[in-house]
Structure formats: C-alpha cells, structure tokens
Regions:
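N-terminal FAD-binding dinucleotide-binding subdomain shared by FAD-dependent oxidases/monooxygenases
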Residues: 1-5, 13, 28-364
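Hydrophobic/small residue at the entry helix of a nucleotide-binding pocket
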Residues: 16
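Aromatic pocket-lining residues of Rossmann-like dinucleotide-binding sites
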Residues: 20-24
C-alpha cells in the first residue's frame, strides 16, 4: 500500500505495529500512533546478505539446524548460566551492550538465565533497555511513554525492531497515550475521536493483536464424538498430551498446539511435523485408522506444563502468551498455554514416546 501524502493512524504498539510503523512513517504525510500499553523491543539489526556470505551460510545449514535442536529455546542462542547480580556491573553492562548490538534474539534468549526468573535481575536488564530507549528517543516525555511500567523485559514476547524508537523523533509522527492522556471515544468517518480531540486519518490500521495459541482452534469449531466442542473442553485452559493431541478427540493431531515447547517457532513446527509423520507411518504399518491419547497422559502432561511455568516471571504478567487478550471476549484470566521448560527435554520426551511404541495413545 502506498501511504504517500496520507494521514495514517495506527492503533496498537505490539509486534505488528512495531514492524510497520517505521516504514509507514517514511511515506505518510502524518502518522498518529494510538498506544494503549508500550512493549519492550530490541534491535533486529537486519542487513542485506551478499552472495559470498550467503554461500558461507549455506555450508553451515546442518550445523545451524543441529545447534537449534540442542538449545532450550530451539534458537542458536543459549542462556548464560551466570547469575546476573554475581557479575560485576562493568562486565554486565559490556555483555548487554554486546547483545544489544548483535542481530536476532540474543538480548532475550542469550542473556543471563535468571533475568526471566529473578525480579532483581529482571529489573536490572529492564533498566538497561529503558536507558537505550531514552538514548534513542529525543523527547524525554515521549521516551517515558514508550517504556513499559507493567512488566519487565522478556516477560512478554520481545518484538524485534528496525528504527522503531527513532521514528518518534520525526516531525510527522505523533504518539497518543490512550490510557493516561486521551482515551479513544469512537471512530468517525474522518478518523479517531479521543477524549481531547479529533485525529484526522485517511487510513486507519488496526494493529491490535490476535487470539494467540488457542484462538485458531476455537475459530474452527472443532467437535468430538457426541458434538463435544474443543473450545468448551478448553474453557479453563488447554489440556493435551505433549501438545500433540487432546483426549476425547480421536485423530485430532496438532502441530504447534498448546503445551508444546515454546521458542523458535519454525523449528518447533519442524519437530511437530516430523513426530506426526512418524506416528502416521506407525499407524499405516499396523493397519490402524484411529488414534486417541489416554486421559491419564493428558492429566500428567498438563500438570508438568503448569509446574514448569510457576518459576517464570512471565506467569505473573498479562499477555497473549498467558491467555489474556482483552480484545477477545472471555480472555481475561491467565492460563498456561505453552510448555516453558527446556526444549531439549521436550524433544527427548517426544522421542521416548515414539521409541516406546506410542503407549501413551490408544489405537484401533
């Protein structure tokens, strides 16, 4: 879409908006950003890849994939096992500067391990990132509005950005705080009306998120024997065996379903496809046409998933990863949606089930 000469409004400052806003601002006559709550974000540091570099990367494909299979989050990054506050302040700051300057999720996934479990450690990394935002945004008041106050760095999924914070230094960009300053009253034919004024918009973009993890399953209206709806069974939270199948829904196999290990999504999908392929080959070899996970296995794995999340600071934060989405009716109570334990342990558990002849499942 061409935004040249247009007055554009964006509602939301989550991952989608953080990616779109810098590009829209380059074209628009004016961009108004309506922010409910700010999110932490870190530099993506994407750059063009030359032919020689691409050829070198191709020679390491197997090495890269093997590395991703060996880390807890299925990324090439692995957390530093030192405790944050045990590291001298100067060394800690240098380490964070290095991570902040590198491409990818290193600042989140390759950081000190306890930033996701220890409040003091998390406060320290949050202060570091807040300092970076203040350095990059010229107006101190705007910078302060862009710094989250309701959650620490890494306790929600961290969006990666390219020039997002610098965008707010542009003369054609306005940030509207719809929680503390200008609540949105209504959308008008001319734009957005807040409690203070009308904001003219030729184009209005809703970057308000999505119903993560279980939302796609709910929208399909999946039903089991007797017309039982999966959405109703999961009303208080999903229940699955290894995130691969819920009980009571024969032949419903899920790739990247609730309660799978979280982290590098493409690698997790790859693992799920490979595992299900093995299961289907097993069924074909034994002339089986129906598979259903055993209820006791679902209960056991669901309890494992819940316990794995208890030590994480993210379990105390409202986010789509904990099942809270106030744009969706009924999504106001936290639920454990993913396995937040070690991805390698999850992979081994799945492999053990397959190697044992899938005893956790009943076949016909």
């Amino acid at each position: 879409m061409d935004f040249t000469g247009k007055r554009v409004g964006v509602i939301g400052t989550g991952a989608t908006a953080i990616q779109a806003i810098p590009e829209i601002a380059k074209q628009a006559a004016h961009l108004t950003i309506f922010q409910r709550r700010p999110n932490w974000a870190a530099p993506l540091h994407n750059a063009p890849i030359g032919k020689a570099e691409m050829e070198e990367i191709k020679t390491r494909y197997e090495e890269i994939h093997a590395r991703c299979a060996e880390t807890p989050s299925w990324f090439i990054h692995e957390a530093d096992r030192r405790r944050t506050m045990d590291v001298p302040p100067e060394e800690r700051a240098a380490f964070w500067e290095k991570l902040y300057a590198e491409p990818g999720f290193g600042i989140w996934m390759g950081n000190f391990r306890d930033i996701l479990t220890d409040e003091t450690a998390n406060a320290a990394i949050s202060a570091f990132i807040a300092g970076k935002i203040r350095q990059r945004v010229k107006d101190p008041k705007v910078a302060d509005k862009l710094i989250p106050k309701d959650h620490g760095f890494g306790t929600r999924r961290v969006p990666l950005e390219s020039g997002y914070f610098e965008t707010f230094n542009r003369d054609n960009v306005t940030l509207v705080d719809v929680i503390n300053d200008e609540p949105i009253e209504c959308i008008t034919p001319e734009g957005v009306r807040t409690a203070r004024r009308d904001h003219a918009c030729d184009i209005l973009i809703y970057a308000t998120g999505f119903d993560g993890v279980t939302g796609a399953f709910d929208r399909i209206d999946i039903r089991g024997p007797g017309g039982v709806r999966l959405k109703d069974v999961w009303a208080d939270g999903p229940r699955t065996c290894l995130g691969l199948q819920p009980d009571g829904f024969p032949n419903l196999l899920m790739v990247l379903g609730p309660h799978t290990a979280r982290g590098n999504i493409p690698r997790a999908i790859e693992h799920g496809v490979e595992w299900h392929t093995g299961l289907l080959r097993f069924m074909r070899a034994h002339n089986l046409t129906r598979v259903e996970t055993r209820p006791e296995q679902v209960a056991e794995w669901t309890e494992t998933v819940i316990k794995a999340s208890e030590a994480l600071l993210s379990s105390k934060v409202d986010s789509w990863q904990t099942g809270v989405n106030r744009n969706v009716e009924g999504r106001t109570v936290r639920r454990v949606l993913g396995y937040n334990g070690n991805g390698m342990h999850y992979r081994r558990k799945c492999e053990e089930v397959a190697a044992g002849g899938y005893r956790e499942f009943a076949f016909r």
